Amino acid sequence: MIRLALFLLALGSMSAPVTAVAAEGLTLRGGNDPRIQQGIDLIYQLHFAEADRYFETIIAADPANPAGHFFLAMVGWWRVLIDLDDRSHDEELYALLKRCIEVCDRRLKEDSEDFDAILFKGGAVGFRGRLRGDRHEFLRAARDGLRCLPLLNKSRELEPTNKDILFGQGIYNYFAEVIPERHPVVRPVMFFLADGDRQLGLQQLEEVAREGRYARAEALYFLAQIHRLFEGDDRAALPYLVELHEMYPGNALFHRYRARTLIALGRWVEGVGLYEEVARRSRGGQAGYHLRGHIEALYYIGKNAFRQRRREAAVRSFVVADSLGFTLGAEAKEQAANGYSALVNLYLGMTYDELGQRDAAVRCFDRVLALPERGTSHKLARSYRKEPFARQER
């Protein structure tokens, strides 16, 4: 959706103990503040409990400063982002964003030119719109974009040379052109906003990725997602994902996106190697390496074995992935795992057909039809249910 969050999560490179933080004078105006870098780095490393304590300490020391409230909400945002299918953290995030907005509003009543209050309110409203967009509440998300734009422009007036604020402008310029094309329902709202400029938005994000102080990593993330999901260019997305994963090797989201993009480019050896590590970390319970990500990893590991005609190995991966799907909930929608459960069963059925186990194959195709469709999964399952799968020889 219209993603106008300004200084998000991607700050800093060195973590520090919670006891090292002090809140006095914490601001995003002016020079680099290592306290911000230290705390936000905990978020990107998915050290959520430690990040909570870090920013709660800031809030306790200076409750009228919106910085602590905003970044505590960012911990909540990453709890959501790491597994978007899990909505159990949504209400907590909305509450944290509301609290941040309220703190900013109190400051703005005293000083309408308060840079931090303007900036953090814009960021909080932007994140609220971002989540609403991810939940397909497109009109409400667009309205948040409408509320956010004046705050974005005002912060730019107050800090015209700040590269990190350029991040918000880049996001706006890109999505203000692209989103109405994809979601016509938001066009009436967009009528009241300035026109977007897709190319300018990309140029601005590139500038932040090169020269940003706090928003550099977030600019890299958006550039990767834009090229993957909106531009359809996995090759252009990959360098950003490699850089992010190398910066934060324990971040499961960057880990999986890098692996998935490598496979999309046909670089199976590298991609499967990364997915094997995803599976190991998932089995070990490492933060961020959840069941849906584990199913995704096993699907690609199994598909690689299927490609190589290592059918027994493929069956092992697919069977484990399917069993994990059942642990996600009682309903087929809950078991879908972003469509990977359907693909797992489709390829498991195809593998069983190659092994001459027709009854097992049919059960798998029936399971595909019971799950939400992913791509052409239902069409293929119906076809293979009628006629056994046979690999086309080249």
Residue positions per predicted region:
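Short coil/linker segments at helix-helix boundaries
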Residues: A23-Q37, L42-F55, A64, L72-T161, ...
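Generic helix N-cap/helix-start motif at coil->alpha-helix transitions
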Residues: R29-R35, E181-P184, G212-L220, Y248-Y257, ...
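Amphipathic alpha-helical segments of tetratricopeptide repeats
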Residues: A60, E102, L149-N153, A209-R210, ...
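Residue-level recognition of tetratricopeptide repeat
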Residues: N65, D114, N162, A215-R216, ...
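TPR/Sel1-like alpha-solenoid repeat signature
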Residues: H69-L72, I118-K121, V125, L166-Q169, ...
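Alpha-helical linker/edge segments of TPR/alpha-solenoid repeat scaffolds
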Residues: W78-H89, R130, A176-P184, G232-R235, ...
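TPR/TPR-like (Sel1-like) alpha-helical repeat modules
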Residues: L149-R156, L193-D197, L202, A279-R280, ...
